[in-house]
Amino acid sequence: MVISINQVRQLYVAKALKANTAALTTAGDIVPKADTAKTTLYFQSMSPAGIVASDKINLKHVLYAKATPSEALAHKLVRYSVTLDADVSATPVAGQNYILRLAFRQYIGLSEEDQYFKYGEVIARSGMTASDFYKKMAISLAKNLENKTESTPLVNIYLISAAAASTDVPVTSATKESDLTATDYNQIIIEETEQPWVLGMMPQAFIPFTPQFLTITVDGEDRLWGVATVVTPTKTVPDGHLIADLEYFCMGARGDIYRGMGYPNIIKTTYLVDPGAVYDVLDIHYFYTGSNESVQKSEKTITLVAVDDGSHTAMNALIGAINTASGLTIATL
């Protein structure tokens, strides 16, 4: 979802669907309305300051209307599996210095050139097993990633054993080798983490990274010792923060133009989105066109968001009410 000043968007938080205007009593109540001939559609909703109405949409000018489920807006945390390259050596080569580098991009700034590097290091000894190697490398990486100035880790590190392939064993800077009791660890998982978010100030961010390998010497040749593979994500970050930021952004077109400047001498804006919830989204994209020199299409979007209970109940009810009132055939979720 792109939040841009180049697109005219009206946002309405639909907390409760109502049957008529008289039933609008609580902030977030909403009712879709149309004329008898079903040529125009508009919404009335209860804002924190009273009843408001949307644009009146000429139904012939609707370009599209599409619902997006909450899971489509959720962010899947990227996971890499790091293993020894069996084509080089499936077991650690004694005497070699194994170095794993994590290259973080867009760190602090948004440029790909804003890079930050962290390392894990293991010196292979005679008789070291692959399982022992993975333990040492995971612990080394976790300790080197520790930063007292960062409240949130840049990545999460896990070990996976052959006997429990679906179980993540977390490794932190406090983990000791004696805490890791399995003898069949066969990969290290490095997972993206959700970074701190502050409404309207710090967007929901994730720091992209790439595992990189330095070379070791095997049979007289310099070889990259490992393989990093992107694997199926197991964790997601829901869209609550994204929708909350969208509401904050859209409020800038409804009088909240100073964004808290002059605090504490300000009028606080009441927001309806719960950042801890998950939301389905409905976009109705349409245009206005006038006569004479105003015949060009002026495109707009009305966006309605509703809490997803896991079955899209609220959004599907809202879509049904819109279809009934207007004659549109918006697909439900």
UniProtKB/Swiss-Prot annotation:
Coiled coil: none
Subcellular location: Virion
Keyword Zinc-finger listed: no
Segments for region (FD): 75-237
A cellular component annotation (GO) from this entry: viral capsid, decoration
Keywords: Capsid decoration protein, Capsid protein, Virion
Domain of life: Viruses
UniProt free text on domains: The central region FD is structurally similar to Helicobacter pylori flagellar cap protein FliD.
Role noted for this protein: Auxiliary capsid protein that forms an outer layer on the major capsid protein protrusions.
Assembly mode: Interacts (via FD region) with the major capsid protein.
Name of the featured protein: Auxiliary capsid protein
Lineage: Viruses, Duplodnaviria, Heunggongvirae, Uroviricota, Caudoviricetes
